[in-house]
């Protein structure tokens, strides 16, 4: 799997980004950061380039050959479905005043084309065999910059809550010759719970090529995780529809491939964070031989893109997509009796 991401932090005069690849438990990452003022009308940074080909429909992402890792690619990401706007996220500390996130995001599912070169081997990427998921968010994002040290202590730092989060866009494509249009299922579930309080949020639904959307009322994740590294290993999502009907989708993890987003600075990596000033231009990266080991996960954190297959138990339809997860605390039902 191939990953690409970038951020533009106007108030910090920073543009940063990353390009990476996951193959089984191996992972390669190239990161770059520069001063926004050096070229304010572009978000290209170091060997990373991003180009809008057709607004809200097709973009091009490029990682040029570089001296950091034996990885390069040039990919066009084309939507099979329209972009879909998610609900605003407004997360705050328990006082209700300080926001940890206040952001809007849209996502899109489709196919990819182009090429990838890894360790000297060139791989052709065709829309018949590669899919893409992408998202674009803006607003106040969590974990930007080095954590502040002069803030009121947050009770959740002393008594960490139980957390279960799953963000999963999945594309369903009719078999060849079957006719019909592609459709998607997008699920976003977020649960924070502590002594005397609980915050639970479900959003998402079914998305169609003509722009129609069928929302879900409630999501019940019945997932399983590996206690060694908190990797998703399987499970299902039970959906409650607005009319009270229920639908179950069985989840199957498609191997070990899945990019750990910590290497892209999500939640920080080796003391560095999104939007952090690294100088006029800074480029670095690394290779992990085994991202599944507890030592690697301790460095990278558990947050990762996981390639999954969803099966609609009612119709038998199969979809393939991404499932990002974060789980924290005591969850015996999820395979995490020790937290």
Predicted regions and their residues:
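Structured soluble/peripheral alpha/beta segments that form catalytic or ligand/cofactor-binding pockets
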Residues: 1-339
């Amino acid at each position: 799997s191939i990953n690409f991401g970038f951020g533009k932090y106007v108030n910090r005069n920073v543009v940063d980004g990353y390009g990476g690849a996951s193959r089984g438990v191996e992972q390669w990452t190239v990161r770059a950061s520069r001063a926004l003022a050096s070229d304010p009308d572009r978000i290209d940074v170091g060997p990373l380039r991003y180009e809008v080909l057709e607004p809200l429909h097709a973009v091009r992402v490029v990682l040029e050959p570089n001296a950091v890792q034996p990885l390069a690619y040039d990919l066009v990401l084309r939507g099979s479905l329209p972009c879909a706007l998610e609900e605003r996220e407004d997360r705050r500390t328990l006082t209700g005043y300080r926001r940890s996130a206040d952001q809007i995001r849209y996502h899109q599912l489709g196919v990819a084309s182009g090429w990838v070169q890894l360790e000297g081997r060139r791989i052709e990427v065709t829309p018949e065999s590669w899919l893409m998921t992408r998202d674009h968010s803006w607003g106040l994002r969590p974990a930007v910059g080095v954590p502040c040290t002069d803030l009121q202590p947050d009770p959740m730092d002393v008594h960490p809550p139980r957390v279960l989060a799953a963000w999963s866009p999945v594309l369903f494509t009719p078999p060849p010759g079957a006719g019909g249009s592609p459709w998607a299922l997008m699920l976003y579930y977020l649960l924070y719970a502590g002594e005397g309080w609980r915050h639970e949020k479900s959003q998402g639904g079914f998305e169609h090529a003509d722009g129609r959307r069928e929302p879900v009322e409630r999501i019940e994740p019945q997932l399983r995780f590996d206690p060694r590294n908190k990797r998703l290993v399987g499970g299902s999502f039970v959906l409650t529809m607005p009319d009270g009907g229920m639908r179950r989708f069985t989840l199957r993890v498609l191997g070990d491939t899945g990019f750990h987003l910590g290497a892209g600075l999500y939640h920080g990596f080796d003391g560095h964070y999104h939007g952090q000033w690294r100088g006029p231009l800074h480029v670095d990266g690394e290779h992990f031989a085994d991202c599944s080991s507890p030592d690697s996960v301790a460095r990278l954190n558990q947050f990762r893109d996981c390639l999954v297959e969803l099966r609609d138990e009612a119709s038998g339809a199969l979809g393939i997509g991404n499932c990002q997860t974060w789980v924290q605390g005591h969850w015996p039902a999820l395979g995490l009796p020790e937290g």
